[in-house]
Amino acid sequence: MEFKDFLNHILTDTKVKLTEAFDRNFERKAFFDDKWANTLIPNRRGSLMMRTGTLRRSIRSNIEGTTVRWTSSVPYADIQNNGGEVEITAKMKRYFWAMYYKAIGAAKGRKGAAKKAFSVEAEHWKALALKQVGNKLKILKRQFIGNHTEVKRMVTEIVDFNIKEALNNIHQ
């Protein structure tokens, strides 16, 4: 086996295995064993990172030379993966107000705990809508791709397996 083929096997195996592992992070709601931070208010529409599945489906992996690279086509992937701050815009404020009115509309006619849950959500949107344009909004880190001890373990396992396969092919 040529070295180029050997390296290609390792890179391809790494791409497949790690892409599957990174995808499972969305199901685990964690970066391997590091749980994601909870949202400030519980949401009735499911997990923050799984509501639409757009971010999860946007992840692509490519082999570039001697490396495997993961990318996403959605603009918010980096801030979700690494955390950070975003500046509130007028457009965001309009969205927050729309979500507030939607939440208070959904609360009408409900009683007890259901009404309280919608009220908490409505108050959250109202608080965001009342923030000034230019204020910073902190986005908590919810890493789904990157370096981790589990990634290192998987890569080592892949390399060891491919070395053993190559040695077995030499001895035949």
Describe the residue ranges of each PLM region.
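Short, Lys/Arg-rich flexible segments
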Residues: 1-172
